[in-house]
Amino acid sequence: MRFFSVRPLLLPVAAGLGLSLLSALPAQAHGIATAGFGAGFSHPITGLDHLLVLVGVGGVAGFIGSSVLLFALVGAVAGAMVGSLGGVLPGAELLAALAISAMGVVILASQRSSRGPRLELIGTVVALAIAVHALLHGQEASGSASWWLGAALGSTLVVGASYALLAQAHTRWTLAVAAALSVAGVALAFA
């Protein structure tokens, strides 16, 4: 049985969450994005709803399996393209917040399932959740390739870090994160 101590991670995680909460509100994540690599890199990290959904994707991948990440990539590319081309989704802000809850619910439901997780269903939920967020990015972002590169790298960093941490963490930690995501998404949806 493998033991994993969370103690060395508490300070960096607390500092990161504290900085995120101080610097980001859901409404700020969907303002007009400025051009440039730095703006693109920071956008998915400083927008609380974007940060939480990316942590959720990493959590789902860590709990279910890394195959989920391919679904997330497809959702990100499709959503960004639709948004960049002027596509509109009524209620996208509400759906983006509820997508955070969906990530938590997917983990919790998978843990309770006696048949094990169904990759196709879980992957579709992840792809749709990320597509909504990427659509909003596509609507608001400049056409700058450096902005998109920064956003892709920032998103990859958050998903990769949360995947690495939660894949190694004890199941109860992953379930606690999933429960927090479930509540946070609903809270942001109705804030």
Regions found by a protein language model. Name each.
Residues 2-191:
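Membrane metalloprotein/metal-transporter helix-bundle signature
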